[in-house]
Amino acid sequence: MLRWLTAGESHGPALVALLEGVPAGVEVTTEEIAGELARRRLGYGRGARMAFEQDEIEIIGGLRHGVTLGSPVAIRVGNSEWPKWRTVMAPDPVDSTELAGQARNAPLTRPRPGHADLAGMQKYGHTDARPILERASARETAARVAVGTVAKALLRQALGIEVVSHVVELGTVATKPGLRPSPADGDRIDADPLRCLDPEASVRMVAEVDAAKKDADTLGGVVEVLAYGVPPGLGSHVQWDRKLDARLATALMSIQAIKGVEIGDGWQQARSRGSVAHDEIIPTATGVRRVTDRAGGLEGGITTGEPLRVRAAMKPISSLNRALSTVDITSGEPATAINQRSDVCAVPAAGVVAEAMVALVLAEAAVEKFGGDSVVEQRRNLAGYLDALVVR
């Protein structure tokens, strides 16, 4: 069983991630994790915070000399800006005289539309949005990317699975239909200012970001994640919570600001007749194959052996320089929302986070299917499973 948790606040000393159930023998380093976190900071339209706030990676358990031990993996992602927040975000009681006059400690009483502020204040009984927004912040995804790096390494080394993402829509701009990057395209995607594989669309996306920034506004978009080398048989049809497409949808919807998930050509299939919506099956020299992959590599909640393909729709960031209308909860009077420092667009980064989430779900399913004591055991079990397939 593979499971994980994160802890920590946006302006706290660190985020912490704990990943349990990782097989022994996965090769991964601090440098690799730092590299993935650097990818999370990519993208045209990011805010000033990305320029000066650094992720300080420390592996504090589960590895020795760059190899997992089979015990829980614990990763600390330190916040280089912590000294500025040490008093305001201190976990222990602080004398009121130390807090007096600190602008960062001023109560945030004007909740932002579209953010967790108001709902969280109501649920947990806070009169200040700070305790809510600190945890609701997308900063938490740094911890997900950290453990997602371990999951990617496991998938690659044990099963030969590679995960890649790209931006397919940003604002009103979309890439050419049918553009499907392979893992070999990863560096080229990351080199693009918006992690877009379509150069012409990327230019228009940059202009869209510039226009939104000029208007003190924000933008959303759509990212696509593909996983190659996924064997048939991960997931199950027998219970609702074992269907892999449901688990992927849950994982992707849990990412901050994600409002929709599509498996394969889901929305287009809904508009099509059955005769052109499904993937016909044909015999080949290497076994049965599907002519197309409209299903996105999943049928009945089970992987088909075709490339897995999912999309996630991200709404525009809810913290705007052009603040929206709200209510000051201390007075009950109309007000403009608080304006926390934020990005114009974080869609490229959402793709990196979505990769991590897809990898974690696939790694969990792989441990369920092929065992989890060691990478060697998983490889052996995968080979035996594929050799014994009744239908190839």
From Swiss-Prot:
Listed binding positions for NADP(+) are R40, R46
Q: Which SUPFAM superfamilies match?
A: Chorismate synthase, AroC (SSF103263)
Tell me the route in metabolism or biology where this protein functions: Metabolic intermediate biosynthesis; chorismate biosynthesis; chorismate from D-erythrose 4-phosphate and phosphoenolpyruvate: step 7/7
Q: Which GO terms describe its cellular component?
A: cytosol
Q: Name the Enzyme Commission number(s) assigned to this protein.
A: 4.2.3.5
Q: Which cofactors does it use? A: FMNH2
Q: What class of enzyme is it?
A: lyase
Q: Which InterPro entries match?
A: Chorismate_synth, Chorismate_synth_AroC_sf, Chorismate_synthase_CS
Give the co-factor note. Reduced FMN (FMNH(2)).
Its family? Belongs to the chorismate synthase family.
Partners and quaternary state? Homotetramer.
Catalyzed reactions per annotation: 5-O-(1-carboxyvinyl)-3-phosphoshikimate = chorismate + phosphate
Picking any one GO biological process from the record gives: amino acid biosynthetic process
What does it do?
A: This reaction introduces a second double bond into the aromatic ring system.
Kindly state which keywords UniProt assigns to this record, in alphabetical order.
Amino-acid biosynthesis, Aromatic amino acid biosynthesis, FAD, Flavoprotein, FMN, Lyase, NADP
* UniProt-recorded Gene Ontology molecular function terms: chorismate synthase activity; FMN binding
Task: State what protein this is by name.
Answer: Chorismate synthase
